[in-house]
């Protein structure tokens, strides 16, 4: 079975009121387009084609060589957008997934189930649908008395009966690839919006007595299409819940999960304790047995097992096992800490390596320094590393005791 994918990402997203293309707004650290593309990978597409338009170079840069791209110059509807992909997929045998790039909550599991349903039922087209308590604004699924899908009608074109229907079109489909592009040649703009509706191919298939099916999502949240900042916030809330629940299932304890922000690519080992108001972003890894107390903020960093981070900020740093940091410490980019290092309150470290079992208990700045092991850095110590033009390295040997301002270019030997 050969699968293909078309991702619709050409729209501007006027209701977002933003210079940024809609699909590039982020949910839990990844753009919506990245979330969709990761889910699409679950069906192992032989080829993925992304339809781009508004600020196309920015959109293209997100996926780079992971996808082929086609350009939709004019925004003439979803049917027109899919037509643009014909140059990439024309004549190919297989099944083509069509999905919008603004649906970040759709899961790979659901897309795989959709494909399996489509193949097992030998459909020419399968619509991913959901049951909505308030279906206003969505296209409705219209079935006959035998339960067969006969058409999809958009909100603006729906009659009174159709507007009462609760089963809605999520905007995700699977088609027989060849039949999709053949049917697209038959659709028109004869509708309330004057656009080429992709949904019109359903009526064409039905007129030819070809089989059209619908696979109903179990979780309505997955159907969310983000068109404004309100929906973006809703997507963020749902994604945050998913992420914290995933980590809890894998052995992480959250004292107050509703207040924690963890991005999609963060890795957390079992037996980590996370208190409230903790933020973990980017490519961060937290080792087993670590405790992150209230207010801790970590970005793109590796925290070794058994460490304790107390109400501190850590950026692009690497900490070995058994390190203690805080409260109110700041580890800036380029910091590495050896095993069992202690960085105390109101200590700032930048671009420095600190050897194992060294202690800097309070009120200290260590910048561009190489500090040995088992060093005691006393209160008020500052490595003066900047002369107004250049920065210089300070070297402090093992077992040294330091408690003063250190001018740049200094080297202090080991004690013992």
From Swiss-Prot:
* Cysteines joined through disulfide linkages: none
**Per the record, GO CC terms?**
cytoplasm; membrane
Q: Which biological pathway?
A: Nucleotide-sugar biosynthesis; UDP-N-acetyl-alpha-D-glucosamine biosynthesis; N-acetyl-alpha-D-glucosamine 1-phosphate from alpha-D-glucosamine 6-phosphate (route II): step 2/2; Nucleotide-sugar biosynthesis; UDP-N-acetyl-alpha-D-glucosamine biosynthesis; UDP-N-acetyl-alpha-D-glucosamine from N-acetyl-alpha-D-glucosamine 1-phosphate: step 1/1; Bacterial outer membrane biogenesis; LPS lipid A biosynthesis
Molecular function (GO) terms listed?
glucosamine-1-phosphate N-acetyltransferase activity; magnesium ion binding; UDP-N-acetylglucosamine diphosphorylase activity
- What cofactor requirement does the entry state? Mg(2+)
**Pfam families documented for this protein:** Hexapep, NTP_transferase
**Highest taxon of the source?**
Bacteria
What is the recorded name of this protein? Bifunctional protein GlmU
Which stretches of sequence are listed as region N-acetyltransferase? 251-416
The record's section on SUPFAM superfamilies has: Nucleotide-diphospho-sugar transferases, Trimeric LpxA-like enzymes
Region: Pyrophosphorylase, residue numbers: 1-229
What the record says about family reads:
In the N-terminal section; belongs to the N-acetylglucosamine-1-phosphate uridyltransferase family. In the C-terminal section; belongs to the transferase hexapeptide repeat family.
Q: Which residues form a coiled coil?
A: none
What is said about its interaction partners and assembly? Answer: Homotrimer.
What keywords tag this UniProt record?
Acyltransferase, Cell shape, Cell wall biogenesis/degradation, Cytoplasm, Magnesium, Metal-binding, Multifunctional enzyme, Nucleotidyltransferase, Peptidoglycan synthesis, Repeat, Transferase
Query: What reaction gets catalysed by this protein?
Result: alpha-D-glucosamine 1-phosphate + acetyl-CoA = N-acetyl-alpha-D-glucosamine 1-phosphate + CoA + H(+); N-acetyl-alpha-D-glucosamine 1-phosphate + UTP + H(+) = UDP-N-acetyl-alpha-D-glucosamine + diphosphate
Q: Which amino acid positions bind acetyl-CoA, per UniProt? A: 379, 385-386
GO BP terms: cell morphogenesis; cell wall organization; lipid A biosynthetic process; peptidoglycan biosynthetic process; regulation of cell shape; UDP-N-acetylglucosamine biosynthetic process
| Subcellular location(s) per record | Cytoplasm
Residues annotated as the enzyme's active site: 362
Q: How is the cofactor bound?
A: Binds 1 Mg(2+) ion per subunit.
Query: What residues bind Mg(2+), as annotated?
Result: 102, 227
Q: Where does UDP-N-acetyl-alpha-D-glucosamine bind?
A: 8-11, 22, 72, 77-78, 139, 154, 169, 227, 332, 350, 365, 376
Q: What biological function has been recorded for the protein in this entry?
A: Catalyzes the last two sequential reactions in the de novo biosynthetic pathway for UDP-N-acetylglucosamine (UDP-GlcNAc). The C-terminal domain catalyzes the transfer of acetyl group from acetyl coenzyme A to glucosamine-1-phosphate (GlcN-1-P) to produce N-acetylglucosamine-1-phosphate (GlcNAc-1-P), which is converted into UDP-GlcNAc by the transfer of uridine 5-monophosphate (from uridine 5-triphosphate), a reaction catalyzed by the N-terminal domain.
EC number(s) in its UniProt entry?
A: 2.7.7.23, 2.3.1.157
* Classification via InterPro entries: Bifunctional_GlmU (IPR005882), GlmU-like (IPR050065), Hexapep (IPR001451), NTP_transferase_dom (IPR005835), Nucleotide-diphossugar_trans (IPR029044), Trimer_LpxA-like_sf (IPR011004)
């Amino acid at each position: 079975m050969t699968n293909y994918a078309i991702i619709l990402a050409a729209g501007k997203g006027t209701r977002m009121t933003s210079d940024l293309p809609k699909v590039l707004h982020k949910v839990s650290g990844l753009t919506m387009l990245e979330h969709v593309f990761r889910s699409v990978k679950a069906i192992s597409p032989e080829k993925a084609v992304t339809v781009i338009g508004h600020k196309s170079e920015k959109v293209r840069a997100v996926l780079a060589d992971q996808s082929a791209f086609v350009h939709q110059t004019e925004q003439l509807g979803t049917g027109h957008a899919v037509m643009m992909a014909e140059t990439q997929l024309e004549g190919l045998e297989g099944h083509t997934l069509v999905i919008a790039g603004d649906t970040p909550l759709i899961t790979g599991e659901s897309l795989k189930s959709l494909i399996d349903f489509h193949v097992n039922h030998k459909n020419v087209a399968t619509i991913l649908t959901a049951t909505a308590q308030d279906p206003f604004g969505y296209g409705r699924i219209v079935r006959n008395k035998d339960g067969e899908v006969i058409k999809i009608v958009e909100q603006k074109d729906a009659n009174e009966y159709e507007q009462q229907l609760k089963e809605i079109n999520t905007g995700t489909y699977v088609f027989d690839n060849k039949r999709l592009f053949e049917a697209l040649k038959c659709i028109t703009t004869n509708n309330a919006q004057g656009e080429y509706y992709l949904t019109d191919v359903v009526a064409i298939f039905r007129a030819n007595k070809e089989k059209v099916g619908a696979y109903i999502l179990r979780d309505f949240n997955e159907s969310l299409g983000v068109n404004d900042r309100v929906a973006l916030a809703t997507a963020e809330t749902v994604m945050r819940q998913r992420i914290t629940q995933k980590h809890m299932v894998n052995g992480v304890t959250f004292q107050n999960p509703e207040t924690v922000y963890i991005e999609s690519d963060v890795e957390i080992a079992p037996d980590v304790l996370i208190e409230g108001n903790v933020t973990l972003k980017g490519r961060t890894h937290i080792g087993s047995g670590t405790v992150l107390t209230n207010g801790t903020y970590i970005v793109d960093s590796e925290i070794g097992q058994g460490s304790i981070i107390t109400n501190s900020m850590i950026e692009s740093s690497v900490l070995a096992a058994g390190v203690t940091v805080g409260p109110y410490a700041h580890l800036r980019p380029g910091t590495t800490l050896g095993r069992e290092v202690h960085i105390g309150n109101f200590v700032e470290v930048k671009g420095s390596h600190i050897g194992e079992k060294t202690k800097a208990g309070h009120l200290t700045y260590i910048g561009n320094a190489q500090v040995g092991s088992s060093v005691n850095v006393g209160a008020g110590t500052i490595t003066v590393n900047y002369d107004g033009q250049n920065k210089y390295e300070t070297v402090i040997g093992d077992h040294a005791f330091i408690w003063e301002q250190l001018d740049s270019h200094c080297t202090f030997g080991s004690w013992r």
